[in-house]
């Protein structure tokens, strides 16, 4: 369990790859412990992008408040720093009302930045740069981003572990924004402790094939629920919906709208892209400090999560 005494407020987090049941577990824990959910999904912030982002439905919330959802139009930029500030305000408000803040989502950069209290640069960051870097990370994976940093700033890369994607992106952001190497200045280090006393629960399946089957089934259900209509909306506004246009779940159908690929082919590409994304999510969270992993397929997964949370809260 990852804990810190910087703040007495307990914060719970439910993380893991796509299609592992994070939303349902978050609701169960909120019902059990009087909590409210803070979404840690970079795409669920956007209005109108519901099916492709697997956004929680009103029925699925069971009346539990869900925050950081449907806040922006798809043409509005939103950075990691924006999320950290937003989540901090939400955490303070939820805790002040005697409720338990529960961070739920698979955007590892959001979760890690919030829980670890990453400091962001004081320099002016060009509009869209952080969103672009986050999209590149999702598309290319952490190894490619680290390789780019090695080429741009070998000294900074040598001082950063390849799996510390937060600092890798910070260094790349500085280089792209200023044209200067971060190693040329005094690097801003991460705070030594997390700003919240936290328990991080991770969901995964023991057999990778289980996860892949769930992902394939989810894509099929999304198509039945109207994913193609959402993808067409993003395609039609791709010049302004730049973040959404790079998101998994929408861009895979652009060839279909352009008449260069069949729908089934695009759906298969989405399934493969989702599987690849799940692998990158696992890589991220497996290297994140303090995650307590649960077998998502186990009948007692929710019961174990409740027990761990109860023990965590009792230590407060």
List where the protein language model places each region.
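Phosphate/pyrophosphate-binding catalytic cores of soluble transferases and nucleic-acid-acting enzymes
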Residues: 1-316
